[in-house]
C-alpha cells in the first residue's frame, strides 16, 4: 500500500525539467516539473506516483488515462475540446481520458498531485 494523505510528509521528487521534457508545450511563464514513479515504470501499462509543477501554464495531450488527486496548491484545468475549466484545491480529484488536450494553469507557486496512469493497449488482432 502507498498512502497519500494531505497531512503527511512529502516525498522528495526527481527533477523532470520543463513541460517540453514530458511532451507538453509551455503557454505562459517558465514552469518546471518534477515527480517520482512509485508504482510500475514509464513503460508499464499502469503506473502511479507523485507529480509537481511550478507556477505557469502549459498544454498537454494525454497519452494515457489518468486519475489524480491534488495534494498541494491550486490549479485550473481546461479541457480544450469542451472549453470546460475547473479549479482544483487540495483533496480534489479528476479523471482525464487518453487523447484529451488540457491546459494546466498552476495558480499557486507550485502544485503536487498523486496520480494513477493507465496506458491503452492495442486490441488483439
Regions found by a protein language model. Name each.
Residues 37-62, 97-98:
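Conserved short histidine dyad/triad with adjacent acidic residue
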Residues 53, 62-77:
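Short, conserved beta-strand element in jelly-roll/cupin
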Residues 103-107:
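Short, exposed beta-strand-loop hairpins at the edges of beta-sheets
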Residues 108-124:
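A short hydrophobic beta-strand segment most commonly corresponding to one strand
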Amino acid at each position: 500500500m502507498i498512502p497519500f494523505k494531505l497531512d503527511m510528509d512529502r516525498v522528495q521528487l526527481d527533477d523532470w525539467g520543463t513541460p517540453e521534457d514530458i511532451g507538453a508545450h509551455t503557454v505562459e511563464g517558465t514552469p518546471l516539473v518534477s515527480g517520482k514513479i512509485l508504482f510500475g515504470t514509464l513503460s508499464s501499462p499502469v503506473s502511479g506516483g507523485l507529480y509537481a509543477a511550478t507556477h505557469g501554464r502549459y498544454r498537454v495531450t494525454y497519452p494515457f488515462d489518468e486519475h489524480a488527486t491534488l495534494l498541494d496548491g491550486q490549479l485550473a484545468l481546461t479541457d480544450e475540446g469542451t472549453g470546460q475549466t475547473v479549479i482544483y484545491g487540495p483533496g480534489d480529484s479528476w479523471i482525464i481520458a487518453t487523447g484529451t488536450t488540457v491546459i494546466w494553469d498552476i495558480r499557486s507557486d507550485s502544485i503536487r498531485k498523486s496520480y494513477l496512469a493507465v496506458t491503452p493497449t492495442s486490441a488483439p488482432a
